[in-house]
Amino acid sequence: MAEPNDVAAAGAAAIAASFEAYQEERARITRRARERFEKRDWAAGQADARERLDLRDRLVNACVGTVRAELGGAAHDHGLWRAMKELYEARVESRPDREIGQSFFNSVTRRVFVTVGVDPAIEFLAADGPAVREGPVPVYARYRREVSTEALLRTVLRACAFAAPYEDLERDARIAAIELDSHLRELDDGQPIEALELVKAVFYRGKGAYLVGRLRRGRYTTPLVLALVHGERGVVLDAILFTQEDVSIVFSFTRSYFHVEVERPRELVAFLSTLLPLKRVSELYIALGFNKHGKTELYREIARHIAETGEAFVPARGDKGLVMSVFTLPGLDVVFKVIKDEFKPPKQTTRREVMDKYRHVFRHDRAGRLVDAQEFEHLAFPADRFSPEVLRELSEECRGSIEIGRAEISVKHLYAERRVTPLNLFIREADEWTARQAVLDFGRALKDLAATNTFPGDLLLKNFGVTRHGRVIFYDYDELTRVTDCVFRDLPTPSGDDEETSGEPWFYVGQDDVFPEELLPFLGLAGRLREVFLQAHGDLLTARYWRAIQERIREGEIVDIYPYREEQRLVHGYE
């Protein structure tokens, strides 16, 4: 019979080996992004993204099976797992991705024990250890500005050394330098560029490649992103972004995750935090594709906020939904969504179908228009931190998802998302110009979603939101479907007065039929805002528009929605 220490060592070794396999496979998939960009193999890039998203759960599940086999009847021995945690920590302590390894261990323990809340004896509560320091080789390269901004940009573009030619590198460096120098003159702080510190790894996503760094200008730093695309005639510097707002949109929670080679994620996150100080650490890990560890960091941020404030969960702003109970913490820009036990008419979906829709969004190109939702299970919160309104709604409508104790309320399943302002409230409260811009972007959002094969299903304004950057996004997924699964039809012409005045449809309507001409009343737009929408986006109300989108998707066209405005494209602006 094996000694307990031997069993613990075997269990820790099994988890460490699984984590090592995960990181190696993840890195292998990520490395392919460069070749996909160079060869313009966008379909393969999409397949890589899906493969990487599924990878961690697959290996964690396999690891759980291995560990159960190693531990046998002691699989739920708490003392044994405490020893395993110590042994595992020793194995990953010196790794540059130590925090990712700790989250991997936590995932395994939670699958085995189905832990409610957090068990500090067998889980890592935080990536404790020394403060983030630059490794022996920093994650960025430093380029001094010795001659001109144009020469500096020319140098960094050449340093990429893609196995594909630039369409016109000299032109791109010249135009980008004009844009950047003009912006810096407007700052009027008298600080010229001294150097550019650029992350060595290229950030790939969809059809884009991004060089990310910061300009050193005396006591100031300026974020900088060079956005590259690969067209039919070669690689092009498509945009240069140099404000916190524009760079933040590149790393938005409405975007799919980057494929970027990173050996020291904690150090890279620390660097990115200097560019984007308003972004939480959790969001940066998630943007880099370490979404499971990002979820761990998000939980820690939530727990820290609860511990440090006297805030209670309160109902989120907006109309109450039929599918979810939604609440928030006033000082934290996160909403929590719990699926209700029953859905009142006219909803005809099921809990499983709702969860499948969220899973679909997780694996889909979010096009900058779909909120990333982090899925949690078995969380516990202090009972005295729930307002009476939230507690009443959870007790009455989500009883199957919660357990109420004297000290804690445990939630079996919830989604956490970034909090945004519901579009219907935003328009109601905004001035006329701002409301017009929101309506225009609402139409653009519908078109971006359509181009990436997403039809919201329910187009009521309350199901859309506005980010702090003024972008319209969609966050209510229970009726979401693929554009290619819909049948877009023109309304038949009535053949007589009886049909024209009938209060019921006098023609057959299939389950997947959509009549775009009938969508306008559901949008809830009136007066001048209705006119603004119709003038700019009236084509959305025609079946012809949607059928054309379906044809493009079925022909294999892959549309990439870039994280910057059309007018920010460099060649577009100077042709």
Curated annotation (Swiss-Prot):
The gene is aceK. This is Isocitrate dehydrogenase kinase/phosphatase. The keyword Metal-binding does not apply. GO terms for cellular component: cytoplasm. It catalyses: L-seryl-[isocitrate dehydrogenase] + ATP = O-phospho-L-seryl-[isocitrate dehydrogenase] + ADP + H(+). Bifunctional enzyme which can phosphorylate or dephosphorylate isocitrate dehydrogenase (IDH) on a specific serine residue. This is a regulatory mechanism which enables bacteria to bypass the Krebs cycle via the glyoxylate shunt in response to the source of carbon. When bacteria are grown on glucose, IDH is fully active and unphosphorylated, but when grown on acetate or ethanol, the activity of IDH declines drastically concomitant with its phosphorylation. Belongs to the AceK family. The keyword Mitochondrion does not apply. GO terms for biological process: glucose metabolic process; glyoxylate cycle; tricarboxylic acid cycle. Signal peptide: none annotated. It is found in: Cytoplasm. ATP binds at A316, R317, G318, D319, K320, G321, L322, K337. Keywords: ATP-binding, Cytoplasm, Glyoxylate bypass, Hydrolase, Kinase, Nucleotide-binding, Protein phosphatase, Serine/threonine-protein kinase, Transferase, Tricarboxylic acid cycle. It comes from Anaeromyxobacter sp. (strain Fw109-5). Its EC number is 2.7.11.5, 3.1.3.-. Pfam families: AceK_kinase, AceK_regulatory.
